[in-house]
Amino acid sequence: MIPEERLQSVIARFEAVQSEMNSDVPRDRFVALSKEFSELEPVAAAIGHLLARRREYADAEQLLRVRDMAEMAKEEIARLNEELPRLEHEVQLMLLPKDAADDRNVILEVRAGTGGDEAALFAGDLFRMYERYASNQGWKVELIAASEGEMGGYKEIIAGISGPGVYAKLKFESGVHRVQRVPVTEGGGRIHTSAATVAVLPEAEEVDVEIEDKDLRIDVYRASGAGGQHVNKTESAVRITHLPTGIVVAQQDEKSQHKNKARAMQILRARIFDAERERLDRERSAARKGQVGSGDRSERIRTYNFPQSRVTDHRINLTLHKLDQVLEGEALGELIDALIAEDQAARLAAMGDEA
């Protein structure tokens, strides 16, 4: 049971925010208060509902001592015994510390791994899956860079996805995705295994990551197309190396050097921000023990088996026999929701261990 003082402190904060919003405050302060208000409002409502039911339970226990009311009180207690655990659980989930990046937009990177042309085709399948899922969520997808495979698909594709709660939903997609199927180039009908790597990076603002000019090496060169031939006569392509971390980003998809540099800096900032978050996560690894996956890019997280039309997420041992619907982006939400639920359960258990 959540201590009442913990619940009352949330309601007190909600009322304080509400009161301050009604006073004369600077615009930037009002914007910050409005954001906090919108986050606290559903939590305060759920807590109010829970506290009301707790009071009803206490009243019913008192009525047990009144002979004429005892039977009705027993029925009331039985009803509340069913309702209260559900309400407690809902409020517990709402009180879990939020990942500060959950509301951020993301940079999605999909790269072909082992498997040559087939891996590039699979990388294309994965990107389209995320594109369709994003469309169903009402999010916006903007292509940043793409290197196409010789037989289709992508050797690498990078896109920005923006909308409410993007990182919260997609953050568990990072890792190695494996496919088992008969490639279009396979005449003997043998099943091959290929892989693609997905990275979901929360988009970083300049205030999140301080990058000094002295820490950058910027090289410019002529953009090249398939086969290595130069596709323009100006040095519009940009490669930026962040010397302290060794992170390198190259960008040539835009026609102007200025735009390519801006794109490269956007990706670089996100990668540095993500690397710092990973470092902090490792330092908190004891607290994170048991949570969904490690976020390790080399961790095999999911297998897509075409002959059996199944998708298995290895982190939570969940198998769906609806591969087509997953790749269409329709059933991907079932996997994502299950991963979020598992993560919440693990964090609740960790909070219980600490209590």
UniProtKB/Swiss-Prot annotation:
Protein name: Peptide chain release factor 1
Role: Peptide chain release factor 1 directs the termination of translation in response to the peptide chain termination codons UAG and UAA.
One Gene Ontology CC term in the entry: cytoplasm
Gene that specifies this protein: prfA
Keywords: Cytoplasm, Methylation, Protein biosynthesis
Family matches, as Pfam families: PCRF, RF-1
PTM notes: Methylated by PrmC. Methylation increases the termination efficiency of RF1.
Chief location of this protein within or outside the cell: cytoplasm
Cellular compartment(s): Cytoplasm
Family matches, as PANTHER family: LD18447P (PTHR43804:SF7)
N5-methylglutamine, modified sites: 229
UniProt-listed SUPFAM superfamilies: Release factor
Family affiliation: Belongs to the prokaryotic/mitochondrial release factor family.
Highest taxon in the source lineage: Bacteria
InterPro entries according to UniProt: PCRF, Pep_chain_release_fac_I, Pep_chain_release_fac_I_sf, Prokaryotic/Mito_RF, RF-1
Sequence segments annotated as region (Disordered): 280-299
Provenance organism: Parvibaculum lavamentivorans (strain DS-1 / DSM 13023 / NCIMB 13966)
GO molecular function ontology, one term from the record: translation release factor activity, codon specific
